[in-house]
């Protein structure tokens, strides 16, 4: 959905002129992103204050006499040498090669927000012990692994080592800045603090404060500390400045990734002299590319990679956050006392990372790898893995704003059948609801929604309807009345219901940080409450940043009040996660906990992967937007959000046929595959294109559906282990420096390499095939190429450059039907691509495709296929799973094989049987026809 500047084009109903006039005055109407509507660091007072602090000796000192070491953690006080304010550092060793530390005020005037509901559990502890000590430092040893932590007292600093190698330093540049809470000055005292949890700022210093010592530079209240104005919006700050900042130094690291969401390259850029990367969930109309502006979601996780090591930093803070990246060269002289702990000589490259958040505490997890797969598992152990989606959601989704009415929906449904195109889901945008009242249907356009859903169900198709988290203020609207009467809306500073302007006009915003609100919302998806809904109706949560058309930066006022007395500034980036969570819970509960939900959300945070899919938002029908979808989804996958996609064709503008074809080809090889379009664009259903383009799109859809068993297995692996589905090349080839900057091609699992064509009029692409000693097979021609090399590959409009790695086995369905549900019992064909050593392996996950029985009743199959010594073996990769299925093995295609004299099938309890085969000597492809064995059975095929 588009934001403020899209309103002029989007509103065609009676209130359109009011919205347009109002928003035109407030924010201005433009044809692209208006940067003036969004803050720079200079315009964000806390970012400006934090960034004004330059590297140097830290004013903080650790009071080693206060150190206490317990079974779960170490605590020590930190003192600011100027203000004499005390902080407390809590340090924990964690199992699985992780460390956590938290810094908070020792005696806060008011508790600071600690982010709940992101961690799936309290991480298990690996005890710390003191292994050395002198007058200015303490050496700690972790119970797991060869790790030591050096706590230096003056200036305060942490260094984390593996054996005698320095991995990471904290506050090495002296940029720790913790704005402690204080009483407002007399000149600032005219404003009363907001009603919250009852804690009121005092008007006099705390006991022990020394006024003459609190008037130094660190105590000066700079502009914006107690009140801030941006454009026409005033932000009261009743609790004063409360920002936190800290630096991390990563010696040996030159390549860092993560901290999505940004429309930028995969590798993070140095931000010195420019804008930091911003993490603040915002509805950005027609966002620009290749800059660090905030977008719809925020995941405060940064990954660092070199050929020998991977590390992660997880900054658990839900407030507005800025991240500075700088490049350095660290010689031994930089480390001072750390000389004693370092080996080698000379200088080493270094990346420095600086985090700055408006409120909250400093809560950091250090993920120590050592490999990137270890980092993925470590992060997944903290925040959970990608939810296993229902099979249908991996098919093709047809959407636009908006399908007009029931007849239009059913015509689109029939169009896919008439043109022999597969499709699983049709989508409805905001116009389907009665006056933008969510959980309702427009009675003139959708008078019989259940009948429409039944018609789709008869075709084994689904419907997704939008349910946004803003509620029309209307006394006759049951949803609004209940929320108001129950007191479940976000409040203003004075305690009244917060109202903003969005699609329905004046709207209330449910307080999803309140567990009672989330339970109420989940209950709204029951079939009784959501009238006209049915089991094949699923949900789209748009605008959940939250988007407020007349709010500052198109979002909510920061001094709005949430459950527990917290301000919106404390919880902003987690709001969208809570919407996603409550909706997914609702879809799960409506089936009695049996059915897996499908929910697409635009805003997200760390942990959102547990609740469904995300997409890259309101993109544009331009070639650069096609290109940028690759690094955007790769970045999301690196931080756990594997189920990602981009609007095929671009949301804004009308794509030329070539661009639309190329987008379908790319979308077919990205996890979430949905075409979507703006209200004012032309209709884009594939059959409306000239026949030559329609045929190419049909082929792209066919490739997607053929690979559904492979996609489903990849999503299960992401769900089980936390590894991304769509991977940068360096994840699989961590020592190949050439791969570290590549973001125009990617891997699906470890088997397929995809290089989409993303340039207009392209006649060829440069494909990098990685891996010393690897071979790669073109999946269409079976031509073999050796790695590592850069290959020029000629392309036509019908080309999708995809290669299968030698050494992998990919399962496919070869009969493309109208939807995935129509294919789920079809036989499997195995594509076995042999390595130079004549080996290959792969997996296949199967279950019923839609319930939680794979979890609750162990009803699933995970089969492992292995080829070596001219023998293909099928065995169980997880003996705990059991699932009866009619699926059988129809064919085996072995790529890179010689011609055997005979092929023999062996199954337990049955005599050997010979299989017919066909061999093509030009392509070295051997096809084994109709082994006819159930996919759940153990068997072996021998080439003799």
Swiss-Prot record:
Which reactions fall under this protein's catalytic activity? N(4)-(alpha-D-Glc-(1->3)-alpha-D-Man-(1->2)-alpha-D-Man-(1->2)-alpha-D-Man-(1->3)-[alpha-D-Man-(1->2)-alpha-D-Man-(1->3)-[alpha-D-Man-(1->2)-alpha-D-Man-(1->6)]-alpha-D-Man-(1->6)]-beta-D-Man-(1->4)-beta-D-GlcNAc-(1->4)-beta-D-GlcNAc)-L-asparaginyl-[protein] + H2O = N(4)-(alpha-D-Man-(1->2)-alpha-D-Man-(1->2)-alpha-D-Man-(1->3)-[alpha-D-Man-(1->2)-alpha-D-Man-(1->3)-[alpha-D-Man-(1->2)-alpha-D-Man-(1->6)]-alpha-D-Man-(1->6)]-beta-D-Man-(1->4)-beta-D-GlcNAc-(1->4)-beta-D-GlcNAc)-L-asparaginyl-[protein] (N-glucan mannose isomer 9A1,2,3B1,2,3) + beta-D-glucose; N(4)-(alpha-D-Glc-(1->3)-alpha-D-Glc-(1->3)-alpha-D-Man-(1->2)-alpha-D-Man-(1->2)-alpha-D-Man-(1->3)-[alpha-D-Man-(1->2)-alpha-D-Man-(1->3)-[alpha-D-Man-(1->2)-alpha-D-Man-(1->6)]-alpha-D-Man-(1->6)]-beta-D-Man-(1->4)-beta-D-GlcNAc-(1->4)-beta-D-GlcNAc)-L-asparaginyl-[protein] + H2O = N(4)-(alpha-D-Glc-(1->3)-alpha-D-Man-(1->2)-alpha-D-Man-(1->2)-alpha-D-Man-(1->3)-[alpha-D-Man-(1->2)-alpha-D-Man-(1->3)-[alpha-D-Man-(1->2)-alpha-D-Man-(1->6)]-alpha-D-Man-(1->6)]-beta-D-Man-(1->4)-beta-D-GlcNAc-(1->4)-beta-D-GlcNAc)-L-asparaginyl-[protein] + beta-D-glucose
| Residue positions with a glycan | 97
Keywords for this entry?
A: Disease variant, Disulfide bond, Endoplasmic reticulum, Glycoprotein, Glycosidase, Golgi apparatus, Hydrolase, Phosphoprotein, Signal
Query: What are the binding positions for substrate in this chain?
Result: 283, 429, 602, 676
Say yes or no: keyword Protease present. Answer: no
List, in alphabetical order, the GO biological process terms annotated in this UniProt record: carbohydrate metabolic process; N-glycan processing
Q: What does the record give as its pathway?
A: Glycan metabolism; N-glycan metabolism
Q: Where in the cell is it found?
A: Endoplasmic reticulum; Golgi apparatus; Melanosome
Stretch list, region Disordered: 181-238
Q: In UniProt terms, what is the effect of altering residue 383 to R?
A: In PKD3; fails to promote PKD1 and PKD2 localization to the cell surface
Q: Which cysteines are joined by disulfide bonds?
A: 41-47, 633-644
Q: Which molecular function GO terms apply here?
A: alpha-glucosidase activity; carbohydrate binding; Glc2Man9GlcNAc2 oligosaccharide glucosidase activity; glucan 1,3-alpha-glucosidase activity; RNA binding
Q: Which InterPro entries match?
A: Gal_mutarotase_sf_dom (IPR011013), Glyco_hydro_31_AS (IPR030458), Glyco_hydro_31_C (IPR048395), Glyco_hydro_31_CS (IPR030459), Glyco_hydro_31_N_dom (IPR025887), Glyco_hydro_31_TIM (IPR000322), Glyco_hydro_b (IPR013780), Glycoside_hydrolase_SF (IPR017853)
**Any idea of its EC number?**
3.2.1.207
Q: Effect of altering residue 95 to R?
A: No effect on PKD1 and PKD2 localization to the cell surface
Q: Which residues carry this modification: Phosphoserine?
A: 52
Q: How does it assemble?
A: Heterodimer of a catalytic alpha subunit (GANAB) and a beta subunit (PRKCSH). Binds glycosylated PTPRC.
Q: Sum up the protein's function in the record's words.
A: Catalytic subunit of glucosidase II that cleaves sequentially the 2 innermost alpha-1,3-linked glucose residues from the Glc(2)Man(9)GlcNAc(2) oligosaccharide precursor of immature glycoproteins. Required for PKD1/Polycystin-1 and PKD2/Polycystin-2 maturation and localization to the cell surface and cilia.
**Related illness:** Polycystic kidney disease 3 with or without polycystic liver disease: A form of polycystic kidney disease, a disorder characterized by progressive formation and enlargement of cysts in both kidneys, typically leading to end-stage renal disease in adult life. Cysts also occur in other organs, particularly the liver. PKD3 inheritance is autosomal dominant. GANAB variations may act as a disease modifier in autosomal dominant polycystic liver disease in patients who have causative mutations in other genes, such as PKHD1 or ALG8.
**In its UniProt entry, what is this protein called?**
Neutral alpha-glucosidase AB
